[in-house]
Amino acid sequence: MRLTRPALLLLLLTGLLLFFALGNHHLQGSTESRVAGIAMQMQVSGDWVTPSLLNEPFLEKPPLSLWLDAMAINLFGGELWAVRLASALAGLTCVMLLYAMLRRMGRPVALAWTAAAMLATMASFWDNARQVGEDALLTLGVTLALLAFYQASRHARLSLGSWLLFAAGIAIATLSKGVLGLALPGVVIFVYLLCQSLIDKRLVLRDWLRPALFTLLGLIPLLIWLCVLYQRGGLHAVGEVLWTNSVGRFSGSFVEAGHYEPFYYYLRKLPESFLPWNLLTYLGLWHFRKHLRNNPYLLFFCVWLVAQFVLLNIASSKRIVYLMALTPAAAVIAAEYAGVVLTWLRAHSQRSAVAKFLSDYHRPLALAVLIGVVAAYLGAALWAPRADRAESFQPVAAQVIRLQAEGKQVALLKPDERLGAVVFYSQQLQHTLDSTAQLQAFLVASPDHIAVVEDPVIPGLPLKVVDRVSVGRHHYYFVSLATLDPGQ
């Protein structure tokens, strides 16, 4: 892509949105604490094959985002912005990719720029592209795979460059989220090819074989990691990645994973999905429904949105963040419908003063809306540290670090994933305990031993609460062994 003036402006706008005040707040919530903790443990331990959280293998997802986070820590140190860098770069790449591919598909500069800007300013996309996690990378992989597939499918001849980009997208998506990274682009491609076959009333075998063959190519990086993981952890480790944490989450058999919601969960979330452009997206879907048979371009993006939405509704495990992979399609549909609205306004400008005003001044009005949205996001970025008190587990880590600096030995009893923040902030591995017996042995060994527990009352084990740190609804107690009065 040539760096034209519109492209440069889009790059600067998206860069400002995604990188402004990226490290001004602590790790917030369980996801950031968990992922940052795993990345730091990977960097400290030197084990880049088996992701581990608080000394236990953590095989919920493949390690691409963890590798990138650990590399950023290695390059820039344990900075908050460093562990968010991979997500922000993935978001920036996704926006620029959408603009470039829409231009290659022959869409006007104004429309391509509008769609990309809508993506960059879509609330769910902006928020997740500024967090530690793998969802921005998943979205980048899915977007690259689907846009490259559509570009390649427009030509009967083999377009090797586009198909290699497709394989790269599959590699990124599957190394980020495993089976889900294959299912999200896969369901779109299947439904789109099925619709095209029904519309054309013929089955073109090469249209089905090419994505299948290049999907196999894209799976090679994941398979290499799984082979190395098998050598380390055996079939159980591979099964945990591919079956327990993928099929189990989809079917609901993996109960411990949580996030199980009723089938209508995402329907309830529609009013807040794809804000602030969701109304344009939904009206666009309705408006374009009659044009899909004769317009493969619109058909593809509508299928992208609807097919993935249906798939996510079928899955037992549901989270609003999973809709991030749909945002590029939502942005394109919203931008296309905005063009339809502008055309309608121009057609009615002779009969309506309002239509004439909106038509004549649509550029400054659109610019004003964009400036307002961007200003709101920048304000939210500056406001983010205010959520630390209820969302950040840094105070727990700070207390652990303080005690260790005083010569105390601290251990964590059955720590949950939120205490991954302790590993990140301390930049060292932590001692963990798995049972009450281990806790008792640890505390008896020395009066300088302190444990972090969530419940300070353990039958048969007298504990003295040294300190308590609360984060939202979570309470962590720093305890030592109580000294009993000899006279009692």
What role is predicted for each listed range?
Residues 219-220, 309, 355, 364-367, ...:
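Generic N-terminal initiation segments characterized by hydrophobic and/or small/turn-forming residues
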Residues 1-346, 383-386, 423, 466-479:
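Membrane-integral, polyisoprenol-dependent glycosyltransferases
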Residues 236-237, 246, 353, 395, ...:
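Exposed alpha-helical structural elements
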Residues 339-379:
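Signature aromatic-anchored transmembrane alpha helix within multi-pass, membrane-resident enzymes
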Residues 254-257, 359, 407-413:
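Cytosolic juxtamembrane regulatory segments of multi-pass membrane proteins
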Residues 484-488:
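Short, charged/polar, Gly/Pro-enriched secondary-structure boundary elements
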